[in-house]
Amino acid sequence: MSKYSDAKELAGLTLGKKTDYANQYDPSLLQPVPRSLNRDDLQLGDELPFMGHDIWTLYELSWLNNKGLPQVAVGEVYIPATSANLIESKSFKLYLNSYNQTRFDSWEEVRQRLITDLSHCAGEAVEVAVNSVTHYTQQPIVTMEGECIDEQDIDISSYDFDDRLLEGAAGEEWVTETLHSHLLKSNCLITNQPDWGSVEIRYQGHKIDREKLLRYLVSFREHNEFHEQCVERIFTDLMKYCQPESLTVFARYTRRGGLDINPYRSTEQAKPDHNHRMARQ
């Protein structure tokens, strides 16, 4: 379990508890989780070593127009990594469900409500796009960039998280390369439900030993943290043990409750070049 799984800030969350589903707009359903919980554990101060966003895709976004006709859309939300809070995913789902039987005058009104409520919960301005389903019909299904490290013939017997698996991972050769793995799996901090993801690591620095990197990523398999926290842990551990000159860690998780979360942390830029979904999303 995470060191902070019993933190008082988590006690009031609806996650892991039986809840009623509201169908009338209710922004009070949103629940924040302080980013400081895991950042204190990672010894991160106010000056973060990365830029980034948490990119959410909202696949189950629906409301009524002013004549009562249901509308459906796909939303994209960009929450800055500098915000005080991340948004707890079950509360996000319940909040979106509250739109289902509520009338709005326009799509723009829905977008503005989302911006206002999510920004208030996160503690910083968020960006929101509300797109029609047809917007996505010509978009590609992509994979991660770079080389996949998953096909290594190695024995693994322990699945307990261990950052020391990265000890000695930095070699002599100086490279610029991108690696990825589809074997990232962790567990929800509260419910212990599995979270499945793929992770892309782009860096410039001493060449990272791929076997050590894969063993490290697999060690998340029984680890309990939220998606965003896992990505920040990967970033800080790579910085600690490998000390690259530049580093980007981008994970794309499978959806749950109509939402997927795609945390992006980088020394180079605050957002990825695209937000195309992958085959498992």
UniProtKB/Swiss-Prot annotation:
Enzyme class per UniProt: oxidoreductase
Compositionally biased tracts (Basic and acidic residues): 268-281
Protein keywords: Cytoplasm, NADP, Oxidoreductase, Queuosine biosynthesis
Residues the entry annotates as binding substrate: I87, E88, S89, H227, E228
GO biological process, one term: tRNA modification
InterPro entries, sorted: GTP-CH-I_C/QueF (IPR043133), NADPH_dep_7-cyano-7-deazaG_red (IPR050084), QueF (IPR029500), QueF_N (IPR029139), QueF_type2 (IPR016428)
Biological function: Catalyzes the NADPH-dependent reduction of 7-cyano-7-deazaguanine (preQ0) to 7-aminomethyl-7-deazaguanine (preQ1).
Quaternary data: Homodimer.
Alphabetized HAMAP family for the sequence: QueF_type2
Name of the molecule in the record: NADPH-dependent 7-cyano-7-deazaguanine reductase
